[in-house]
């Protein structure tokens, strides 16, 4: 595979990951803010204030990934949102471990890897633009 094909493939994969994270965090934010009683997780029923806070954070994360797709909005916002999602997933994993729910962190780890991959790819792209 030539270098330009690899770069194009990387851009496609990064775009798919970004889109999936946008959908995930926008959905999670809307569900936590508008329908908190319908959430299936035990922790959500025990911590309604935390559900509201994480709902806002999730929605901001989704918007932080979505807005840079619009014209005249810096793609650095994607990088910052991906870093923020990484911190959020680390905190969520720690939260579950402290609650004795370490079997629940697989999804958090998957999202963490996706966010770090997106941050790596966007950082790499931003450095190439500067050259």
Cite the ranges covered by each PLM segment.
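Membrane-interface extramembranous regions
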Residues: 2-131
């Amino acid at each position: 595979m030539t270098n330009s094909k690899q770069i194009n493939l990387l851009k496609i994969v990064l775009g798919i990951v970004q889109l999936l994270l946008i959908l995930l965090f926008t959905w999670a934010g809307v569900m936590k803010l508008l329908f908190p009683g319908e959430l299936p997780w035990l922790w959500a029923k025990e911590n309604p204030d935390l559900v509201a806070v994480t709902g806002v954070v999730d929605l901001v994360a989704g918007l932080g990934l979505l807005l840079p797709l619009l014209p005249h909005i810096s793609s650095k916002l994607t990088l910052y949102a991906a870093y923020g999602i990484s911190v959020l997933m680390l905190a969520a994993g720690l939260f579950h471990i402290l609650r004795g729910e370490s079997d629940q962190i697989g999804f958090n780890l998957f999202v963490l890897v996706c966010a770090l991959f997106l941050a790596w790819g966007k950082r790499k792209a931003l450095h190439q633009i500067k050259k």
